[in-house]
Regions:
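Charged structural interfaces that engage phosphate-rich ligands
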Residues: 1-739
Length: 739
């Protein structure tokens, strides 16, 4: 069975591989250009630039040329999905009566009836509660304007790069979706036990709840939230109850405790959507004042608080064509939400918990309670003395703030297979066992909904990634489990990995390295890596490009280049291709039928005020260039499009003088051409030519030139390989069919 992380084999994209190589050589030129430049840049966030840099170093020019001419090795990899499976995948992608989401916990996909998801999980359980309100219009444009005003107000707090990064974004409104919490549904647990199958079917479980997510990777406040996350995150480890992860829990858990203790866990009910803005900002004020020395001095308290308030109060999102606003709490999805929630809970523990505990317990008892309480965001764990009144503790916790409520669970007494009686309770992925003599043991914890469906070995992943999975999983077992449980869990893991297609020798090697606490260190890793970043594709292997780069850079003759690339080792850094989760799920939801694909060609926008479309753009589906070649446009392009390769033709010369170029935002570049043609204040030869023609013919009325487009790509870096073809117009390599 293929889980959500399974990657189908994809066909090789030669253009993308050449773009990756071009980006790598650009990195080499940047390293050479700025090697001796001293910088005191303290920016916590900054954007990536796409400008093309030139080098005067002849040896580097030769190296760049050889790397860019080195083609990836073409292979013919067998597809890892059958024809029937591919048809089924296409059917699921286009299904308009279901919604597919990843389960909140575990490697599981959940296929739900579309109306059940909309009415029950989203509207009834979330949007129709007091946390959210529907608004009439989309206010993101005014939010972005207010953001720029905020940045102007606190301009002294930000570097130029930070301010540019936050304010220069092509924002998009967020989308709302819900991840089903199948591990908390009794109906689903019962169905799993009854059906005992790789997949479980049941009808509309009423006890199914979900985790609300606001997906805003490009929302107006995203980059400001990213900066706040960098500022606040160092404060979180200062909290007394803080645990970083499972490994941290194990390091802080005592091996033994008194035999009169119980295991206790607690969980904050809907923490992210329960924190009132006033409480959260009060908590931030407390912590940034207490640990002022841990925050760069240029960030004033006022800026941090106003920026946090701005992110919290401008959380707009779309769902099913409507615009909503989250009124309470923070969006689970914005960058600074985890440290914000942690600091808020830490503030309540620091300022309210101990005084309230003293109403029921002695100072010594209070100290023990606080020292033996651990918390990971909204999950808490405690070793609780039996002689203390637990009801008083629960009363105290639920009185810390009217909006913050806890649920509690005590450990259950069970008998192990060897007859040993223990009290058991899980915290995160650890199962903690307390013996009657006070000894503590641990085991790895699997939820009842865990399918042990690990990444199939035939998934389209790099070999080293798949070969490392047995080691990683085995090491987790060896670290998490007390010695007497290790072999049993490793046997279970071996069975699961074999079922996923892993060769026995790969499993044995991984388990062996895990027992040794890791493979032998690789001396090559001592060198600084110089990554060539590329999406993995077994049909086009970029290892030859990397090995060529390594040979060229290790044998440079120029003294400056020797210093620049000293101890640098080019490596291949692989990105994951689209897996089933990415292909089958979407943050955007609409109950209306899917729109028909837009017609290919160059089209005018619907804005009557757009002079570019009204005077310059001619709608067309194909066009003829100066040499008589006709080109077909294969995507829907308007003045709003991005990452466009375009073609300009001077109207005064009947198309004899032309220009082919590339741009990120199409409208901005065209407006720049129009302005430069009119003024003549430019170094662009085409614009200067048009300007001279305008003077010669004494005609300054628009249009000055005709605009056509070749294609639109998904990312600015994919424009880079076309640079060599822009003036020759040899576009066969970019899959544009000549007509």
């Amino acid at each position: 069975m293929k889980g959500p992380k399974f990657c189908p084999t994809t066909r090789g994209n030669f253009v993308h591989k050449k773009a990756d190589a071009k980006e790598f050589t650009r990195k080499l030129k940047l390293m050479e250009k700025f090697h001796d430049v001293q910088t005191n840049d303290t920016s916590l966030v900054k954007g990536k630039t796409f400008f093309q840099v030139n080098t005067e170093n002849e040896e580097l020019k030769d190296i760049v040329s050889k790397i860019e001419r080195c083609d990836p090795i073409s292979k013919d990899t067998q597809m890892n999905l059958t024809c029937g499976e591919r048809k089924a995948l296409d059917t699921l992608k286009n299904a308009d009566d279901v919604v597919i989401k990843k389960a909140d916990k575990g490697n599981v996909l959940v296929i739900m009836d579309r109306e059940f998801y909309r009415q029950k999980l989203v509207l009834q359980d979330h949007l129709h509660t007091a946390c959210y309100t529907k608004v009439d219009t989309d206010s993101d444009e005014s939010v972005f304007e207010d953001l720029c005003t905020l940045l102007d107000k606190h301009s002294k707090c930000l570097t130029v790069k930070e301010r540019t990064y936050i304010s220069n974004s092509d924002w998009q409104t967020s989308n709302f979706y819900v991840l089903p919490k199948i591990h908390k549904s009794e109906a689903i647990k019962n169905a799993i036990a009854e059906q005992n199958s790789e997949y479980v079917t049941l009808s509309a479980p009423e006890d199914l709840k979900g985790r609300p997510i606001v997906a805003g990777p490009n929302c107006p406040t995203k980059r400001l939230s990213e900066l706040l996350d960098k500022i606040l995150k160092p404060l979180v480890p200062q909290l007394k109850s803080f645990v970083k992860d499972d490994w941290d829990v194990l390091s802080k858990l005592p091996q033994n405790c008194t035999d009169d203790c119980e295991l206790l866990s607690c969980d904050v009910v809907s923490l992210y959507t329960s924190i009132p803005h006033e409480l959260g900002l009060e908590a931030l004020q407390y912590w940034i004042s207490k640990h002022r020395n841990m925050i760069p001095s240029r960030f004033t308290n006022r800026f941090i608080l106003e920026a946090a308030a701005f992110v919290l109060k401008n959380n707009n999102f779309h769902f099913d064509g409507d615009v909503w606003l989250q009124r309470v709490g923070t969006a689970m999805g914005t960058d600074f939400a985890p440290p914000y929630a942690c600091l808020t809970m830490g503030y309540l523990e620091e300022t309210k918990l101990k005084p309230k505990l003293l109403e029921f317990f002695t100072p010594t008892q209070c100290q023990f309670i606080i020292e033996h309480f651990f918390r990971y965001i909204d999950d808490g764990f405690s070793l609780w003395p039996k002689d203390l009144n637990l009801d008083h503790f629960m009363e105290v916790m639920n009185s810390l703030h009217p909006s913050i409520k806890f649920t509690f669970e005590l450990g259950k007494k069970l008998t192990l297979h060897d007859g040993t009686e223990v009290t058991m309770l899980n915290f995160l992925d650890i199962l903690i066992m307390l013996h009657t003599n006070g000894q503590l043991e641990t085991d790895i914890y699997y939820k009842e909904t865990n399918t042990h469906d690990y990444l199939p070995y035939n998934s389209h992943h790099p070999e080293h990634v798949k070969n490392n999975i047995p080691y990683t999983l085995a090491k987790k077992i060896i670290v998490f489990c007390s010695s007497r449980f290790v072999e049993m869990r490793l046997t279970e893991l071996r069975t699961a990995l074999l079922a996923c297609g892993y060769p026995a020798h790969i499993i044995n090697k991984g388990f062996h390295n895990a027992r040794l606490q890791g493979p032998a260190p690789d001396p090559e890793k001592k060198k600084k890596t110089l990554p060539l970043v590329s999406t993995y594709n077994s049909n086009l292997d970029s290892k030859k490009v990397v090995s060529t780069s390594r040979d060229l850079l290790s044998n440079v003759k120029d003294e400056k280049l020797k210093r620049v690339f000293a101890n640098q080792s080019p490596t291949l850094a692989l990105k994951q291709p689209p897996n089933l989760l990415r292909q089958l799920t979407s943050a955007k939801f609409t109950s209306s039928p899917p729109c028909e694909p837009k017609e290919s060609g160059l089209f005018k926008c619907n804005d009557n005020k757009c002079k570019l479309c009204r005077l310059f753009i001619q709608q067309c589906k194909s066009f003829t260039v100066a040499d008589g070649t006709e080109w077909t446009i294969k995507s829907h392009i308007t003045c709003q499009s991005k990452c466009v390769v375009y073609y300009l033709s001077c109207i005064f010369c009947n198309g004899k003088v032309t220009k082919t170029g590339k741009t990120n935002i199409f409208r901005k570049r065209m407006n720049n051409h129009i302005s430069d043609c009119k003024s003549g204040d430019t170094s662009d030869k085409f614009d200067l030519h048009v300007h001279e023609c305008m003077k010669k013919h004494n005609n300054f009325s628009k249009p000055y030139f005709k605009i056509y487009v070749y294609l639109e790509v998904s990312h600015p870096k994919f424009l880079i390989p076309y640079e060599d073809h822009l003036h020759t117009r040899n576009f066969d390599t970019i899959s544009k069919r000549k007509v």
